Amino acid sequence: MAQIDPPADALVGDWLTLPEAADRLGIPPGRLKQLFRDRKLLAVQRPDGTMAVPAAFFDGGGSIIKGLHGTLTVLLDCGFGDGEALRWLFTADDTLPGTPIQAMTERRGTEVNRRAQALAF
């Protein structure tokens, strides 16, 4: 898992530790590793050394937001590392408007994926 720098850490804002993320999903902490391997979820090492998951990756019902897996797959297939993908998801994009992660929480994942796919060209 990637380590991120303080500016990227600040972009995200709210974080969940791995035990908190597992609790939010209602699964044992060990199952998170499979979600990371399957690219359904992304965790990074924060500047303070803790492993964490952005809280924005979860909806109000305790599930991973719709479309995150597909977007992560597209970004990683484009050659992004975990830290770069995280930074892209939380950086404002005037064409959306807002950040890609905000658009995904508003069910505009198709728009986000189109922009992510365009990065490959």
Positions of the model-derived regions?
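Non-transmembrane "mature" sequence context
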Residues: 1-121
